[in-house]
Amino acid sequence: MLVLLNKPYGVLSQFSDRSQPPKRTLAEFGLPPDVYAAGRLDHDSEGLLVLTDDGALAHRLTDPRHKQPKTYWVQVEGAPQAEHLQALRDGVALNDGPTRPAQVRMLDPAPQLWPRDPPVRVRKTVPDAWLELQITEGRNRQVRRMTAAVGLPTLRLVRVAIGDWRLDALAPGQWRAEATTNARPSRSRR
């Protein structure tokens, strides 16, 4: 079984939490039994999360050797210049080593998304912009660290695709089951 969920902001990518006070988890969304997240989204990130009961599929989605593309819409603080975008395309030096090259483009106009609760802070004197960033790794907070490393801190991060699976019109907290015949990730073009 394969389930696509639009994980809301402020929800952990797991079904339980033992911290005090407990945080919101996937348990509140009425997901089918026996599925688990194939990969993660940070507590403060939103968007597409794939859940499955198929261990081999989960491995193909999460093992970096498979170079599964993951696409994000990223609201950044600042006005990206050509050199910022090129640095992301070339790969960024992080404290745990260089990233693989990424695909990146400006999103103009900004994507029409659901409101976030709490809203992203607005600073009238500081510009912001939206990028579409596609990576083939899945390091901890990788997109946020990449944009910060080139001088563009992330304000909002929404995953919109994993391979050929897209978020489409799923509202936050909504999910849909996909036929298992569709449960094949795309092949990376890199």
From Swiss-Prot:
The keyword Metal-binding does not apply. InterPro entries: PsdUridine_s_RsuA/RluB/E/F_cat, PsdUridine_synth_cat_dom_sf, PsdUridine_synth_RsuA/RluA, PsdUridine_synth_RsuA/RluB/E/F, PsdUridine_synth_RsuA/RluB_CS, RsuA_PseudoU_synthase, TruA/RsuA/RluB/E/F_N. Keywords: Isomerase, rRNA processing. The active site is at residue 42. GO terms for biological process: pseudouridine synthesis; rRNA processing. The keyword Isomerase applies. It catalyses: uridine(2457) in 23S rRNA = pseudouridine(2457) in 23S rRNA. It comes from the Bacteria. Its EC number is 5.4.99.20. Pfam families: PseudoU_synth_2 (PF00849). Gene3D superfamilies: Alpha-L RNA-binding motif, Pseudouridine synthase I, catalytic domain, N-terminal subdomain. GO terms for molecular function: 23S rRNA pseudouridine(2457) synthase activity; RNA binding. Belongs to the pseudouridine synthase RsuA family. Responsible for synthesis of pseudouridine from uracil-2457 in 23S ribosomal RNA. PANTHER family: PSEUDOURIDINE SYNTHASE FAMILY PROTEIN-RELATED, RNA-BINDING S4 DOMAIN-CONTAINING PROTEIN. This is Ribosomal large subunit pseudouridine synthase E. The gene is rluE.
